[in-house]
Amino acid sequence: MSEPDGVLDIHAHVAPAGLITDLAAGRVRFLHVDVRRRDGSYTVAFRGGPPTRPLAAGLTDPGLRAAWLTEQGITRQVVSGWLDIFGYELPAGEGADWSVALTEAIAALTAADGRLIPLGTVPLQDPERAAAALHQRPVAQIPGVMIGTRAGGRELDDPAFTPFWEAADAAGAVVYLHPGSAGATPRYADFGLVNGLARLEDSTVTLARLLYAGVPARYPGAKLVVAHGGGALPYVLGRLVRNHLIDPGGTADPVESFARLHFDSVVFDPAVLEFLVAKAGPDRVMLGSDYPFPIGDLAPRSVVERAALPQEHRDQILGGNAARLFGSAAAAPSPPMPRPAPSGEAAR
């Protein structure tokens, strides 16, 4: 490709093994964080709630990640925490401390491999503390944060989140919006529909609310990136516009805020990627994999290279757009430190 900054995968997850093992061994303690061994891995539970699924090897094994990056011809990878361990269930103070511990652990592991770019976390259940955490991050090293679609029982368009959005706007921070499984009613219990559809519904509803509330347009300094190609949003935007025209006094123009969004390429189908590029613009789409999960695109360059797009647009998606959005953090990487050989397959 022609882009000097190489190929950048902006959508990948990690669970810092050092922090997890320290918690399991009692070397690090949080009152409401419970880490236990299960099926040769670990689970994490918050505030007495149900445990997560066992941590996938690809989340914790740096050797697997390093080998995969080389195999796929990916120069840099933006790594974010696994949403299941963000700890939004925790009390505000403990949640703030947990967010710091998780962000520092992510930053430490990326420092050991110059190809990795960290995104932090914030205690989104307390918007004031989330704003403070965003301001306190080392900007040159951590260009932004990943957040879920809701926290503390509130939607992201709730006025309570104003301090967070103001902080993101002022800091020019990347805010990567990632769904959970909050939309997974019993209707999604079969056929793998939690991953196949519920997460996309979660994103789409959150985005529709943000657009109608005018949040992206009101805070243009916040670089809002959306996972999984924006869910269904690009396809239903016309309907949202029609709904706005019926009630223009009660909703902001969704097109104005849609134009502020950035998207990853995790859509799998070249025709869908072509539609996304046509709808959002070639400067608004970036390569993503959702590594290490099977529902992700673990050969992410393929969909870009198969899409009927000009080579200039492919180059933008494969690296140019991300290099611009992530700024100095996406500069040419230093050589990675030696890694152990891969010990297994990445699996969710």
Predicted feature residues:
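Active-site core of metal-dependent hydrolases
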Residues: 147, 192-204, 217-218, 224-230, ...
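Hydrophobic faces of well-ordered beta-strands that scaffold small-molecule active sites
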Residues: 8-10, 77-79, 117-120, 145-147, ...
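Aromatic-lined glycan-binding groove of carbohydrate-active enzymes
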Residues: 211-214, 218-256
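Active-site gating/metal-coordination segments in enzymes
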Residues: 75-206, 346
